[in-house]
Amino acid sequence: ADLEAEAALLEVLRPTGLPILSEEMGADASFSLDRDGWIIDPLDGTMNFVRGIPVSCTCVALWRGGHPVLGVIQENGRDCVWTGGVGRPTSCNGSTVQCGNASVPESAILTTGFPRCFDFGDASLSETMRRLSQYKKVRMIGCAGLALAWTAGGMMDLYREENIFLWDAAAGIALVEAAGGHATFTPIDGQWRTTVTAGSPSLVAAEH
């Protein structure tokens, strides 16, 4: 399914002439984070999809000037399409949405996840539990794209994940920012991994 979705996306995006970074095929030779390009994840939440859990999506982001400026996420389980970016307020199936305005962790829902390369050593786990314990609720849905889309829609208050791939997060970052939220991330060219904090401006500020 992921390869079929990628083929369909490439058929649409190739005519634009912009280089592409995709989870499945990797990066075009000309793709660079300091140039315009597309970043796509044909199927985010693959394990959920394989196991029949209706929490997966397709993510497409337009990257410009070192930042995602447009995001589109097709939510498979609910047949919802999220769109948003610079000059385009975030919407879900055409209805405008906004980030939540939670100002303190004690009243907020955090959505997060553990990447496959997560450090499960004592020090890392202790710091992670300290961070998670601040929040009223914590949700791990196994799909970064939807976690960010749901944060943009106010269903979650903050998304934070370390060492996440750009193709998992780029579209969602654009959605959060276009919904009035803030996002911080520092991508590394050639590695395509970053740590993302996105959602309520007050909560993002509190994490830094």
Regions found by a protein language model. Give the residues of each.
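Oxyanion/phosphate-interacting regions
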Residues: 126-130, 146-208
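Acidic beta-strand-loop-alpha-helix segment within the catalytic core
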Residues: 60-148, 194-208
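N-terminal subdomain of lithium-sensitive/metallo-dependent phosphomonoesterases centered on the IMPase/IPPase/PAP
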Residues: 1-43
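Glycine-rich active-site/cofactor-binding loop and its immediate structural neighborhood
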Residues: 34-77
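Short glycine/threonine-rich catalytic loop with a Thr-x-Gly-x-Asp
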Residues: 49-52, 140-141, 164
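Residue-level signal for inorganic ion chemistry
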Residues: 2, 13, 46, 75, ...
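Short, Asp-centered acidic motifs that coordinate Mg2+ and/or phosphate
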Residues: 19, 70, 109, 157-158
